[in-house]
Amino acid sequence: MQKPIIEFRNVSKKFGNKLPINNVSFTVKKNNITTLIGPNGAGKTTIVRLMLGLEKPTSGEIIIDPKLKIGYVPQKFGLTPDLPITVKNFLELLAPSNFNNNIKEINSFIDLEHIKDQEISKLSGGQFQKVVLACSIVNNPDLIILDEPLQSLDVTSQQEFYQLINLIRKKLNITVFMISHDLFTVIKNSDQVICLNGHICCSGIPNEITPNSEFSNALSALGFYTHHHDHKH
């Protein structure tokens, strides 16, 4: 059995008197798409900061290979596409040393050629998310963390985004860890779903989210509407 690339073991984190996450355990498997969902204030940002080494756990253990290269796109970046700089120049700033080689490979499946000379501020939502993905992989990471990448995208753009993510992980052998509020899209496109509300309410593979299952009931209790998962689309 393959060793997970990240493992949280009974992790808790306190900030003063606040305990945003309590006794959290989960694993992230190599080359999977793992999605973390939960309401506002559930501790999702704290999980990401712990993954990135920006915070240390108050108790518990986080097992992560120190050589693991992580590409991270924060939520705020995804919501502020107003930079007065071209796509090509922006990517070059992120990875100047190996830019030419990497951008050719990225271009082969993300297809930035027709927008590379456009200013970021002029891009559509779908085009901007392509740039977000390119930013996350331009330095050849083993794992990419995407914080709410589907916000402000229509259904068609969301599906195109997931198609790109699948292509990227297969071509580059990259693991994907995502935070999302869009449960229905998550269920269709993730290998593993983790539901967080300060602690792990439920986790598993999408086909375990069946009506009246423990997983489905936990999601419903947090306000996630799961019934429409039964319908054929």
From Swiss-Prot:
EC number, as in UniProt: 7.2.2.20
Swiss-Prot/TrEMBL keywords: ATP-binding, Cell inner membrane, Cell membrane, Ion transport, Membrane, Nucleotide-binding, Translocase, Transport, Zinc, Zinc transport
ABC transporter domain residues: 6-222
Entry GO MF terms: ABC-type zinc transporter activity; ATP binding; ATP hydrolysis activity
Major localization class: membrane
Disulfide bond sites: none
Main enzyme class: translocase
Catalyzed chemical reaction(s): Zn(2+)(out) + ATP(in) + H2O(in) = Zn(2+)(in) + ADP(in) + phosphate(in) + H(+)(in)
Pfam families with a match to the protein in the record: ABC_tran
Protein's membrane topology: Peripheral membrane protein
Subunit structure: The complex is composed of two ATP-binding proteins (ZnuC), two transmembrane proteins (ZnuB) and a solute-binding protein (ZnuA).
Role, per record: Part of the ABC transporter complex ZnuABC involved in zinc import. Responsible for energy coupling to the transport system.
PANTHER family the record matches: METAL TRANSPORT SYSTEM ATP-BINDING PROTEIN TM_0124-RELATED, ZINC IMPORT ATP-BINDING PROTEIN ZNUC
Protein name (Swiss-Prot/TrEMBL): Zinc import ATP-binding protein ZnuC
Taxonomic source organism: Rickettsia conorii (strain ATCC VR-613 / Malish 7)
